C-alpha cells in the first residue's frame, strides 16, 4: 500500500513539474531476481546509461502475486497501472488510457526512448508519445511460432502496430524472426 502512495505523489508532482529524460525503463517487479533485488536483464543498460550520462527513469510495475521486492532505485508505477486496469474494465484500450492519463497528470513527462521487458504496456507508452522509440528487451527463448513475436507468418500486432523494435541476445534470435516473418518487419 505504501508503494501506491509513493507512486501517487510522484505522478501528481508531474502535474506541476516538467521532467525530460532520455530513456524510460519499464518492467514488472517479478524480474527483480538479482542481488539487492536488481533486474539482471536491465542492469547492463542502467550501467551504460550512467557511463554515457544518459538520463533515465526506472518504473516498476506492481505484481501482487510475486514475492520479489522492489529495487530501491525504481519508481513504483502502481498509481498509473491501477488506473489503466480500471480503465480497461470500462473498455478503454491502453492507448486511450494513455491519452486520459496524459491529460490528467502525465503531460509533463517527456521521454525519447522506452525499454520494456515482456512487452509490458507498449501500447500505453505509444499512446503517451507517438514519436518515442520503443524497445522490447528479449528475456527468454524466441522460437519460430512464439505468438508474442510471430503469428501466422508475421510480426505480432502488438509489436508491429506500436512500431516496437527488439533488443535481442544474439544474431541467432534475429535470424529466427527474419525467417519466420513473411512481412519483413524484423529485417
Where does each model-flagged region fall?
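Active-site and donor-binding regions of nucleotide-sugar-utilizing enzymes
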Residues: 2-180
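The feature marks helicase ATPase cores and/or their adjacent C-terminal helical subdomains
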Residues: 183-187
Amino acid at each position: 500500500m505504501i508503494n501506491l502512495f509513493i507512486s501517487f505523489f510522484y505522478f501528481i508532482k508531474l502535474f506541476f513539474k516538467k521532467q525530460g529524460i532520455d530513456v524510460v525503463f519499464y518492467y514488472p517487479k517479478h524480474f527483480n531476481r538479482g542481488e539487492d533485488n536488481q533486474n539482471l536483464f536491465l542492469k547492463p543498460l542502467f550501467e551504460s546509461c550512467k557511463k554515457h550520462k544518459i538520463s533515465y527513469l526506472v518504473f516498476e510495475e506492481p505484481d501482487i502475486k510475486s514475492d520479489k521486492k522492489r529495487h530501491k532505485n525504481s519508481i513504483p508505477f502502481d498509481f498509473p497501472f491501477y488506473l489503466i486496469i480500471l480503465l480497461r474494465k470500462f473498455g478503454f484500450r491502453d492507448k486511450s488510457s494513455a491519452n486520459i492519463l496524459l491529460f490528467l497528470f502525465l503531460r509533463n513527462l517527456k521521454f525519447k526512448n522506452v525499454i520494456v521487458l515482456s512487452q509490458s504496456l507498449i501500447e500505453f507508452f505509444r499512446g503517451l508519445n507517438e514519436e518515442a522509440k520503443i524497445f522490447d528487451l528479449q528475456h527468454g527463448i524466441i522460437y519460430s511460432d512464439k505468438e508474442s513475436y510471430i503469428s501466422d507468418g508475421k510480426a505480432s500486432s502488438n509489436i508491429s502496430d506500436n512500431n516496437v523494435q527488439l533488443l535481442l541476445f544474439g544474431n541467432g534470435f534475429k535470424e529466427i524472426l527474419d525467417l519466420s516473418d513473411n512481412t519483413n518487419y524484423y529485417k
